[in-house]
Amino acid sequence: MTQGPSGDQRIYDLRGVEFLYGGTHRALQSVHLRVDAGERIAILGANGCGKSTLLQILGGLLFSTAGEAQAFSQSLTEERFRDASFNAFFRRRVGLLFQNPDVQLFCPTVLDEIAFGPLQLGLPREEVLQKCREVTRMLNLEKIASRSPHQLSGGEKKKVALASVLALNPDVLLLDEPTAGLDPRTQVWLVEVLDELHSVGKTIITATHDLSLLEEIADRAYVMDEEHDLVAEGSPEEILDDLDLLLRVNLIHEHAHEHEGFIHRHGHLHAFAHRHDHGDRP
């Protein structure tokens, strides 16, 4: 496997990756990205910028229409995934949590849902049951294990979808807007779970537009613009300090008003302090 600059194992290496839906609608534009083992990465961008498409390429569900995408030093191509041994290897090592948990939930009970993935990969039944017990205990799902996923609240569904991913014990977690639709308490719970997973060496890549969580979920961030390109990379602190960048990619908004004869422009960074630019008198 390719070694990163610090000697760590390189998980992902994307070079000039592009993607077109239907051969005409551009979703990704010349994306360059690298991820080493054990990193916490955020992919930031406004709705519709291509974050979900990028995660699905990283998850081996979509394939680039130009450029090269590699994972574990192997090309992520449709042909490569026809190899049953590589497909099984990849599916065991990479788990994807969709933004909408209903996409992942289709089994009669929560326990069936958690067991589905490991059983599909051919793991022994006793091992699958042990994994189910561990995951339900970790995510506090014991009381709802026999219920239908479709009878659960949005937050409970998200927990079950995450449990179905964790049951495979993947090395890499791809999370698409994981806090979307969650109440504040469940958001805090999820961040704590992600911290615990990172502490045991998991590589975590989170696509989000929620800047208030950035410093808690990532050590490095990429920023996508509305032209579907990665336009910046840096630490959470560097990204959050660059208000011009955040305005340009539509992650914060700005408004102007007059005060004491001057024009004040405010860039609102959600839960953070906002910028005051003093312009000329009108």
What are these regions (language model features)?
Residues 208-209:
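H-loop/switch region of ABC-family ATPase nucleotide-binding domains
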Residues 237, 241-282:
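ABC ATPase nucleotide-binding domains
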Residues 148-152, 156:
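Conserved ABC ATPase signature
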